[in-house]
């Protein structure tokens, strides 16, 4: 039967409602059900449009093989939700433990690399190899042929990044490789900006604000007088980070709904704001207080990655549900925890690099007078506290708001958190652990 036409846009959570009431949830659930039917439901995903025109910066890439690398078979919703719904910790949360907690077994074929001792995490299966190979092939073709991302001497680092394995592991519910490529292009573009503007490959805190603002216009277009529009348009081709941002965003907006695209723009602005705080400390040769560092890390973190889980999954979390304070808290806790994972796994890499690199163990050691080992182990404890808080808040939200798109979004964020840890643990090209145990 034909899909019913959606009603005109309106808030599904009236202003006067300060908590999730039963009547509101019923209306939101109905609307979310209609929305999922329109975009193809949880398993299908909305079809992706053709690639954007006019983005080629080199010879055409070879013909791609069929895009329908199937998603690995996933367990039912009850199993998927088990991790979140058994997550609460602390007084007063026992009633939210809706299913018995069960740790997934460590896969027998786990890649090399060991987890940080004592770090709270959930082992995950190895990413689907067919998808990893196809995403890896396509992202390299995009980087070289469409955006001229890097010179030949950086190829080993690009390959060592293993971004295909990273994104396949973080988005297990993506219906197609095309959907996975949305996340993969953005991840590569974000790292190009970080490396070329902020860190390894010519980055500097001097003038960073100007570079980031102009690059951000590749995500959030400039609308100005006709006389000056061509100059701005030409600037989007000026360097690899802007070319990558422009192309990745053009692909993304053709697959995402307007509110999903706007969500990403705002999350990227948050990221850039965090870059600027860290740059200011570098210019002043200042080590911030621990709480100041953690505040910066709530902005300079992975947030733009898990919050596109619905677009990559082929569905949409309504904007008013995404904006709820409870959802924002869950997203912030997940993003903060995953970023400390990066601080911990990249610790030895950053110590070996020229200059002083701020990370949580370094800041704690400096500000609290602890040994390097004690500061590192305290950072592990902080990560674990944030992870438990994330799971508790996610479980509470899942129980309070049984809307399909909310449940699936929470599962997607949790999957991203787990996949992010798995990639850091297994990527021994980039990361090794300190000798603290």
UniProtKB/Swiss-Prot annotation:
Cofactors named for this entry: Mg(2+)
Cite the residue spans of the region called Disordered.
Answer: 32-125
Give the enzyme's main class according to its UniProt record, as a single word.
lyase
Q: What's the EC number here?
A: 4.2.3.118
Q: What's the name of the protein?
A: 2-methylisoborneol synthase
Enumerate the transmembrane spans: none
The entry marks the following residues as binding Mg(2+), namely 194-195, 199, 342, 346, 350
What the protein does comes down to: Catalyzes the cyclization of 2-methylgeranyl diphosphate (2-MeGPP) to 2-methylisoborneol (2-MIB), which likely involves the intermediacy of 2-methyllinalyl diphosphate.
UniProt keyword list: Lyase, Magnesium, Metal-binding
Taxonomy, top ranks, is: Bacteria, Bacillati, Actinomycetota, Actinomycetes, Kitasatosporales
Q: Which family does it belong to?
A: Belongs to the terpene synthase family. 2-methylisoborneol synthase subfamily.
Give the free-text miscellaneous remark of the entry: 2-MIB is a volatile organic compound that has an unusually low odor threshold. Together with geosmin, methylisoborneol is responsible for the characteristic smell of moist soil as well as unpleasant taste and odor episodes associated with public water supplies and contamination of various foodstuffs, including fish, wine, and beer.
| Protein's GO biological process | terpene metabolic process
Q: Under the GO molecular function aspect, what terms does this record hold? A: metal ion binding; terpene synthase activity
Which reactions are catalysed by this chain?
A: (E)-2-methylgeranyl diphosphate + H2O = 2-methylisoborneol + diphosphate
Signal peptide stretch: none
Q: Which Pfam families match?
A: Terpene_syn_C_2 (PF19086)
Q: Which InterPro entries match?
A: Isoprenoid_synthase_dom_sf (IPR008949), MIB_synthase (IPR047945), Terpene_cyclase-like_2 (IPR034686)
**Compositionally biased spans, kind Pro residues:** 59-73
- Which species is the source of this protein? Streptomyces griseus
């Amino acid at each position: 039967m034909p899909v019913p036409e959606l009603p005109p846009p309106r808030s599904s959570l009236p202003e006067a409602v300060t908590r999730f009431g039963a009547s509101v949830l019923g209306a939101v659930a109905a609307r979310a059900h209609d929305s999922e039917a329109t975009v193809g439901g949880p398993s299908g995903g909305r079809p992706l449009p053709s690639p954007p025109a006019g983005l080629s910066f080199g010879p055409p890439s070879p013909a791609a093989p069929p895009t329908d690398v199937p998603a690995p078979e996933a367990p039912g919703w009850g199993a998927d939700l088990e991790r979140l719904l058994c997550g609460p910790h602390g007084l007063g949360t026992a009633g939210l433990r809706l299913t018995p907690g069960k740790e997934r077994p460590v896969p027998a074929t786990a890649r090399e690399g060991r987890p940080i001792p004592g770090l709270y995490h959930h082992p995950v299966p190895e990413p689907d190899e067919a998808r990893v190979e196809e995403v890896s092939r396509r992202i390299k073709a995009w980087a070289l042929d469409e955006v001229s991302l890097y010179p030949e001497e950086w190829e080993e680092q690009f390959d060592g990044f293993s971004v295909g394995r990273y994104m396949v592991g973080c988005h297990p519910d993506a219906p197609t490789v095309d959907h996975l490529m949305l996340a993969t292009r953005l991840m590569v573009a974000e790292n190009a900006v970080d490396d070329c503007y902020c860190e390894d490959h010519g980055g500097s805190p001097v003038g960073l604000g100007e570079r980031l603002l102009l690059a951000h216009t590749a995500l959030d277009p400039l609308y100005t007088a006709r006389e000056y529009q061509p100059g701005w348009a030409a600037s989007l081709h000026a360097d690899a980070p802007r070319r990558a941002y422009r192309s990745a965003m053009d692909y993304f907006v053709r697959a995402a709904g307007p509110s999903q695209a706007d969500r990403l723009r705002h999350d990227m602005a948050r990221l850039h704001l965090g870059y600027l705080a860290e740059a200011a400390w570098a210019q002043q040769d200042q080590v911030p207080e621990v709480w100041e560092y953690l505040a910066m890390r709530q902005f300079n973190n992975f947030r733009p990655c898990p919050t596109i889980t619905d677009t990559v999954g082929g569905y949409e979390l309504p904007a008013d549900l995404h904006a709820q304070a409870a959802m924002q808290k869950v997203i912030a806790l997940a993003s903060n925890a995953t970023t400390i994972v990066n601080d911990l796994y990249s610790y030895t890499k950053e110590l070996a690099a020229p200059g002083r690199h701020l990370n949580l163990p370094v800041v704690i050691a400096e500000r609290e007078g602890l040994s390097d080992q004690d500061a590192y182990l305290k950072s592990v404890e902080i990560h674990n506290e944030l992870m438990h808080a994330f799971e508790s808040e996610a479980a509470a939200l899942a129980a309070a708001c049984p809307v399909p798109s909310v449940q699936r979004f929470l599962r997607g964020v949790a999957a991203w958190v787990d996949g992010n840890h798995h990639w850091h643990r297994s990527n021994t090209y980039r990361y090794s652990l300190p000798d603290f145990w």
